[in-house]
Structure formats: C-alpha cells, structure tokens
A protein has these predicted regions:
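Tryptophan-paired
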Residues: 1-25, 78, 83-198
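Outer-membrane beta-barrel proteins
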Residues: 65, 159, 236-238
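Solvent-exposed, conformationally flexible loop/turn segments
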Residues: 47-49, 53-61, 129-136, 197-199, ...
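Interdomain boundary/hinge segments at the C-termini of tandem beta-sandwich modules
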Residues: 54-56, 67-70
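A short, Gly/Thr-enriched small/hydrophobic beta-strand-prone motif that recurs across taxa
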Residues: 69-82, 240-248
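Low-complexity, acidic Ser/Thr/Pro-rich "mucin-like" tracts of secreted and single-pass surface proteins
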Residues: 185-260
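Exposed beta-strand and adjacent loop surfaces of beta-rich binding modules
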Residues: 74, 87-92, 166-168, 213-215, ...
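Structured interaction patches on ligand/partner-binding surfaces of diverse proteins
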Residues: 20-62, 179-194, 198
Length: 260
C-alpha cells in the first residue's frame, strides 16, 4: 500500500477480512465501530492500531511492520466417551452464550451482562460415526465475564455459580432411554475463570465418564411414551374414530434442562 501524507505523527487503523470498505471515518468512529458475529467464517476478521511518526524525507518512507490480530477467539473441542460406559452415545454439540457484536479496534472495557446481547451457535448434530468421539472448532468474540473465586472444584463450575452470560459448550448425549446434557464453561482455567479474550485459542479435551448427576455440570431426564391404542389396532394401523390417549412421562431429579 502506498500513500502520501505530510510529516507528523499518525494513528494508523487497519482492518482485514471484513469483506467491505469502512469508508471515511473519524478516529472516534473507528474506535466505536462494531462488527456482527457470523455463524461461519471463510476468513477471520482482523485489525490493528499503531502510532507512526513520518519524518520529512524527499524519498519513500517505509513504515514499521504492522501485525494484525484476530478479533475472535478460537474454541477447539475434542470429546470422547470413556470405555467404561459403552452404552453412552454423543448426540450433539452447541456453543452457547456467544456475543453478537464486538468493537473492531478496541478490546471490551467491560463485559455485557444483558442476555439480549448474546446468541447461541447453530446446533451441531453428530453423525453415527461420531457417537463415541468427536472434534470441532468454533469461533466467538471476546467475552470477559470475570472470575468467581469461591469455586475450588471444577465440578462446581456450573450454571449455579457461573456469571449469567458466560460462554459454554453444551453436549447432548443418550444412555438407554435417558437424555443427558453436559455443560462445560470456557475460561482460562477449570475452576474460577470465565474470561474469553480476543485473539486467543482454547482447546477443550473432554472425557465423558458417565451420567452421575452428583456432578453439577450434568443434567438428565428419562422420557417414556405410552398409549392406549391397542384395543383399536388392526395390524400396524389404528381404526378411527376412537377416543384414545398418548401419555408422555418425564422423570428427572432437577429442574434443568428446561423442556418445551
């Protein structure tokens, strides 16, 4: 890139992979500029801000090397089911509590605590080949939700103790007629920290060892469906008209997950 300017000190703002020209904007407008989270990225948005001094020179002045940084965090996960639970199968994975917007050039001064500023990533339904193990990568904007110093055991890094808008991975599995949900919060450690910074990389190696709901990160329910159609059945068909009922019974020990 070549451009002409008078000698002096300048603040240089650079954006990459946005797919659009930002146009002419003041310094304050650039600092306030936000971008929207995307479900998929062909290229990751990047940015940089640097102060440069241009000295008087009759020739060409070469600026210092400028490094752009990603405005997103990379979340990689590797999930496997332990051999001791051969009847437990993975069903889906979803990244939840994803910030919808972020400023392009400046890190967040404070995290949002309003749920309307967050969304969930699309549900990743797992194929039959991934019932016992799966891997994937997701991207999200920074979400520095802080720390909770009272958490001393990773089993207590759960919805009861986490900040309301902290980001987490929701894993759905099945064991027999039980549906299980495993909630794994992001952060810089396995206990107190719920911070996700821009231009960071997080790798979650998760081993599911069972459906023990003593671990407060695990929620499950058993669903049974019965009917009284038998008296009106002919082969595989039910004869109409008749009065019959379909019974749905849900058994669980906790109020979560919410069922609709």
């Amino acid at each position: 890139v070549r451009f002409e300017c008078l000698p002096g000190e300048y603040d240089l703002y650079v954006a990459a992979n946005l797919g659009a020209d930002l146009g002419e904007r003041s310094a304050q407008q650039l600092l306030d500029y936000t971008i929207k989270w995307q479900e998929e990225y062909a290229t990751l948005p990047m940015s940089a801000v640097m102060t440069v001094a241009i000295a008087p020179d009759k020739g060409t002045v070469t600026l210092p090397t400028l490094s752009v940084r990603r405005t997103v965090a990379k979340i990689a996960y590797n999930i496997r089911v332990a051999d001791k639970v051969p009847d437990l199968e993975l069903r889906s994975v979803r990244l939840c509590s994803v910030p919808e917007y972020t400023t392009l050039f400046t890190p967040a001064s404070a995290p949002s605590t309003s749920e309307k500023d967050f969304t969930d990533a699309p549900l990743v339904e797992l194929p039959d080949a991934a019932r016992r193990s799966c891997s994937g990568v997701q991207y999200l904007f920074e979400n520095p939700q802080g720390t909770v110093s009272s958490i001393t055991d990773q089993r207590d890094k759960n919805a009861d103790n986490a900040p309301a808008c902290a980001s987490y991975l929701m894993i759905r599995a099945a064991r027999g007629n039980r549906t299980l949900y495993y909630r794994v919060y992001l952060g810089r450690n396995n206990t107190t920290d719920f911070n996700v910074g821009r231009n960071t990389s997080h790798t979650l190696d998760i081993t599911i060892s069972g459906d023990n709901e003593v671990d407060t990160r695990v929620h499950g329910y058993t669903l049974s469906v019965t009917d009284d159609f038998e008296s009106n059945r002919i082969g595989d068909y039910c004869v109409l008209p008749f009065n019959a009922s379909l019974y749905v019974n849900i058994e669980r020990t906790k109020s979560e997950p919410t069922l609709t």
